[in-house]
């Protein structure tokens, strides 16, 4: 783990509180583990023909069931997506404390001759469970509300941790018709906490033949009858894992894993719920699902972080792609900086923007770790350092704004915590003499190496090709798909086309009306010397300053809207220096910043007014304006825009507008678009997906009955 575990702010709950909130399902001995293993093996066997198996679990408990699902997955050609819903968020430190103080994940039991083989099997899997537990801890789950997507083994295993009120989490998700939940496991301590509405939301997300299993249901006839009746009323069949085996029955007691005769009336009720969802969010059209995982299915224009991570997310699903980059190398646009800060954008209200950036930052951080620990062959290492990010104010106004953020929420300490001036100095290893807000899991990453590593891994996993020095000048929609045109060549047709080309995002007729603006940024490169070279964390105030990498610090960045040129600017170089002087006045290390070499890099980032990236279907703006002539400024028009799918260019998608925080937001936005294109569950709630939609600026006004 990167952040120091001995900080008193990291663990706020003691062991007794933890075991009350996250109880073990049963005595974790050989008897229970054997039953659990048999049950989970049967689930995988029942769905062995599926390339992707979606499982749901209500409750985290002590984590044993989650780890056991992971361990039991044996089919190398099948991917697993496990969605775990837990009302009480927990972080890696508390999870480790829970496991450490309970001594073992699988408790030893007295030797019993008739159970010798089961006990031996349980002990054999103990080592594997411990390895998986450490892998999970290394992914740094944090105690935030919402979904955290954890991807392991190059996409073979994905775990979605949905923390927060279960009803809220379930109802916020969209149904995936191609890949619904096939089976649910409900931990017993949450059985009675599942209200009728939650059960119907589970049904909405489920396959028509999906079933439910729980543990210990048969021990209480009253609870059994009540629970079974409630779930049967939603179209489920319910089984008890404990019925799998006893000394007398062995392992032959059946557990229902597929509901072969679902009630037609109850299935209709589920469909009504799905239709209600679809109607309520009709203005936010989703991507058309790819029919087959062939390379010719999809083209991606762009060679930076967005296109690279979309390619990787598709490749993890077995989906090939053709990538077109106008430069001689990847990462030559906004992704070309030597170092970029990676940390979440937080708001006082912890609104959708703040929650998205927490999810996205953590996802991106895990991507860096995964590409570092299991790189592709001959992959260039990703230069990075998760040394934390220290945010401080630079004037009275910014201090008030920062104080509001700090005091606005009980932020999980693994996300950020306040430090006084003395602590800030100790973290930075240079004198700042002012308080701040420290993001312990943040740091810096080399963006172009990050993009290249993602592409290299994608090429290892799927049929991916990259065409460099290929400047796409025009795109055309034809009957059989999208055609891409250069000055001399023609590519396609492609069923799906994604524009992820950064500063050139608006260059085509189909995208030139996107409400997004280019901003020039000049990043100064200054030699590491004297006190300055001791800087040990990323500083963020009026501008940012990174620790040294290969003898240079990055200091930036200018922010010029719609720039006229991308040449070096001496004035912007001096402005970058002055920002540091304004942020940390009278500090002696400022004299160590030597700008005389005029060493800098200039790039353009595309920025949206609301700071969300753009991800989703490309809006057909001409058609929106045409429809607006017929439906405007009335109550009926608001209903029309609410319930009518917004006009889009079929098969064309946007992935961009990453702004200054693309390292944090880009990989998750790419993952969500890949999930849409492949018809898989998306790790974001419906409201956040609306915020990411490229049509949002127009639809926001139309849904309120305002003029465009």
Swiss-Prot record:
GO MF, one annotated term: oxidoreductase activity, acting on the CH-NH group of donors
Manganese in keyword set: no
Pfam families, sorted: DAO
Compartments, as annotated in UniProt: Cytoplasm
Recorded GO CC terms: cytoplasm
NCBIfam families reported for this sequence: MnmC_Cterm
InterPro entries according to UniProt: FAD-dep_OxRdtase, FAD/NAD-bd_sf, SAM-dependent_MTases_sf, tRNA_MAMT_biosynth_bifunc_MnmC, tRNA_S-uridine_synth_MnmC_C
SUPFAM superfamilies to which the protein is assigned, alphabetical: FAD/NAD(P)-binding domain
PANTHER family in UniProt: SARCOSINE DEHYDROGENASE-RELATED (PTHR13847), TRNA 5-METHYLAMINOMETHYL-2-THIOURIDINE BIOSYNTHESIS BIFUNCTIONAL PROTEIN MNMC (PTHR13847:SF283)
Main location per the UniProt record: cytoplasm
Function per UniProt: Catalyzes the last two steps in the biosynthesis of 5-methylaminomethyl-2-thiouridine (mnm(5)s(2)U) at the wobble position (U34) in tRNA. Catalyzes the FAD-dependent demodification of cmnm(5)s(2)U34 to nm(5)s(2)U34, followed by the transfer of a methyl group from S-adenosyl-L-methionine to nm(5)s(2)U34, to form mnm(5)s(2)U34.
Cofactor: FAD
UniProt-annotated stretches for the region FAD-dependent cmnm(5)s(2)U34 oxidoreductase: 301-708
Family: In the N-terminal section; belongs to the methyltransferase superfamily. tRNA (mnm(5)s(2)U34)-methyltransferase family.
GO BP annotations, alphabetical order: methylation; tRNA wobble uridine modification
Segments of this protein annotated with the region tRNA (mnm(5)s(2)U34)-methyltransferase: 1-278
Protein name per its UniProtKB record: tRNA 5-methylaminomethyl-2-thiouridine biosynthesis bifunctional protein MnmC
Species: Shewanella baltica (strain OS195)
UniProt entry keywords in alphabetical sequence: Cytoplasm, FAD, Flavoprotein, Methyltransferase, Multifunctional enzyme, Oxidoreductase, S-adenosyl-L-methionine, Transferase, tRNA processing
EC numbers: 2.1.1.61, 1.5.-.-
Catalytic activity reported: 5-aminomethyl-2-thiouridine(34) in tRNA + S-adenosyl-L-methionine = 5-methylaminomethyl-2-thiouridine(34) in tRNA + S-adenosyl-L-homocysteine + H(+)
């Amino acid at each position: 783990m990167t952040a120091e575990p001995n900080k008193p702010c990291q663990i706020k709950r003691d062991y007794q509180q933890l075991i009350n909130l996250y109880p073990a399902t049963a005595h974790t001995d050989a008897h229970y583990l054997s039953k659990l293993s048999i049950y989970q093996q049967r689930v995988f066997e029942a769905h062995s023909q599926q390339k992707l198996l979606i499982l749901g679990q209500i409750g985290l408990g002590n984590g044993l069931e989650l780890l056991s699902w992971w361990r039991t997955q044996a089919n190398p050609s099948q991917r697993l997506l496990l969605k775990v819903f837990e009302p009480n968020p927990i972080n890696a430190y508390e999870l480790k404390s829970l496991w450490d103080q309970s001594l073992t994940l699988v408790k030893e039991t007295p030797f019993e001759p008739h159970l010798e083989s089961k006990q031996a099997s349980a002990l054999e899997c103990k080592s594997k469970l411990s390895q998986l537990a450490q892998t999970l801890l290394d992914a740094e789950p944090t105690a935030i509300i919402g979904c955290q997507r954890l991807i392991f083994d190059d996409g073979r295993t994905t775990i979605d941790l949905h923390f927060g009120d279960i009803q809220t989490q379930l109802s916020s998700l969209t149904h995936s018709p191609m890949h619904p939940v096939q089976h649910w496991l409900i931990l017993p301590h949450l059985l009675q906490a599942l209200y009728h509405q939650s059960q119907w939301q589970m049904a909405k997300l489920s396959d028509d033949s999906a079933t439910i299993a729980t543990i210990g249901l048969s021990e209480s006839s009253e609870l059994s009858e009540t629970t079974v009746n409630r779930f049967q009323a939603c179209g489920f069949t319910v089984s008890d894992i404990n019925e799998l085996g006893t000394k007398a029955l062995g392992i032959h007691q059946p557990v229902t894993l597929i509901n072969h005769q679902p009630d037609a009336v109850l299935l209709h009720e589920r469909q009504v719920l799905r239709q209600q969802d679809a109607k309520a969010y009709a203005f936010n059209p989703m991507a058309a699902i790819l029919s087959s995982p062939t390379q010719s299915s999809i083209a991606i224009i762009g060679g930076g972080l967005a296109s690279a991570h979309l390619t990787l997310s598709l490749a993890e699903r077995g989906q090939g792609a053709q990538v077109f980059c106008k430069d001689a190398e990847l990462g030559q646009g906004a992704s070309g900086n030597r170092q970029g800060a990676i940390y979440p954008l937080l708001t006082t209200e912890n609104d959708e923007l703040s929650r998205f950036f927490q999810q996205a930052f953590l996802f991106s951080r895990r991507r860096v770790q995964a590409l570092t620990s299991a790189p592709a062959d001959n992959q260039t290492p990703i230069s990075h350092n998760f040394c934390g990010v220290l945010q401080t104010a630079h004037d009275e106004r910014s201090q008030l704004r920062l104080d509001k953020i700090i005091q606005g929420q009980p932020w999980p300490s693994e996300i950020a915590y306040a430090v006084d001036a003395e602590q800030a100095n100790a973290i930075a290893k240079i004198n700042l003499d002012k308080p701040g807000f420290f993001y312990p899991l943040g740091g810096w990453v080399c963006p172009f190496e990050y993009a290249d590593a993602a592409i290299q891994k994608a090429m290892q996993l799927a049929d991916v090709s990259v065409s460099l020095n290929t400047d796409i000048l025009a795109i055309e929609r034809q009957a059989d798909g999208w055609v891409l045109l250069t000055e001399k060549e023609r590519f396609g047709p492609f069923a799906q086309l994604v524009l992820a080309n950064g500063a050139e995002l608006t260059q085509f007729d189909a995208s030139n009306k996107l409400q997004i603006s280019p901003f020039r940024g000049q990043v100064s490169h200054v030699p590491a010397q004297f006190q300055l070279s001791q800087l040990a964390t990323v500083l963020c105030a009026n501008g940012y300053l990174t620790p040294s990498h290969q003898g240079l610090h990055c200091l930036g960045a200018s922010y010029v809207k719609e720039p006229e040129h991308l040449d070096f600017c001496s004035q912007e170089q001096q402005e970058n220096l002055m920002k540091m002087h304004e942020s940390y006045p009278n500090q002696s290390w400022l004299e160590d910043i030597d700008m005389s070499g005029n060493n800098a890099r200039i790039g353009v980032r595309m920025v949206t007014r609301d700071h969300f990236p753009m991800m989703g279907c490309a809006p057909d703006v001409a058609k929106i304006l045409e429809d607006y002539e017929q439906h405007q400024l009335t109550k009926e028009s608001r209903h029309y825009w609410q319930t009518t799918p917004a006009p889009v260019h079929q098969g064309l998608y946007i992935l961009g507008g990453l702004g200054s925080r693309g390292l944090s937001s880009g990989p998750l936005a790419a993952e969500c678009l890949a999930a849409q294109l492949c018809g898989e569950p998306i790790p974001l709630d419906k409201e956040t997906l609306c915020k990411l939609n490229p049509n949002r600026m127009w639809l926001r006004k139309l849904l309120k009955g305002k003029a465009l």
